[in-house]
Each structure stands twice: as C-alpha cells, then as structure tokens.
Amino acid sequence: MSAEESEEGATPAEVIEVVGKTGMHGEAMQVKCRIQEGGNQGRIITRNVLGPVRVGDVIQLKETAREADSIGGQ
C-alpha cells in the first residue's frame, strides 16, 4: 500500500495547541487543530491523537465532524 492510498479521503489539520494527556495510562494526547481543507476549512476542533505530536505538526483526519470530550470535565 502506497502513502497516497493510505491518505485517500483524509483531511489535513495543523496542531495549534497540545491540551494534555488522556486515556487510562496517558497514552493519547488531546490537541486542538485547525482544519486546512474541505468544507470545515479554518474550523478549530479538539481531537485525541496517538503517538508523539507537537505544535505545528500536520495530522491527517479521516473525519472532521467529530470532536473529543474535554479532559477532566465534570
């Protein structure tokens, strides 16, 4: 499988803030990212991301409509 095939249908989003760690063992990072293409272009959403991530990284989102719940909300 080539890189082009795996990114088919994905939307790029730039990480603008790392909110914190989430998950039972802190394995995921919650980030705020700005959608760069498509109908939601310019919208800022909160997502959970696995693996190392920092501000300025561009991640590929399969779905831009879903948002993650806030960390430690009551």
UniProtKB/Swiss-Prot annotation:
Pfam families, per the entry: Ribosomal_S28e
**Which Gene Ontology MF annotations are present?**
structural constituent of ribosome
Q: Does the keyword rRNA-binding apply?
A: no
Query: Which InterPro entries does the UniProt entry name for this protein?
Result: NA-bd_OB-fold (IPR012340), Ribosomal_eS28 (IPR000289)
Q: Which domain of life is it from?
A: Archaea
Q: Which BP terms in the Gene Ontology apply to this protein? A: maturation of SSU-rRNA; ribosomal small subunit assembly; translation
**SUPFAM superfamilies in the cross-refs:** Nucleic acid-binding proteins
Q: Name one GO cellular component term.
A: cytosolic small ribosomal subunit
Q: Which CDD domains match?
A: S1_S28E (cd04457)
Sorted alphabetically, which keywords does the UniProt record give? Ribonucleoprotein, Ribosomal protein
Q: Does the keyword Ribosomal protein apply?
A: yes
The record's listing under HAMAP family reads: Ribosomal_eS28
For this chain, the family text in UniProt reads: Belongs to the eukaryotic ribosomal protein eS28 family.
NCBIfam families under this entry?
PRK04007.1
Q: What is this protein called?
A: Small ribosomal subunit protein eS28
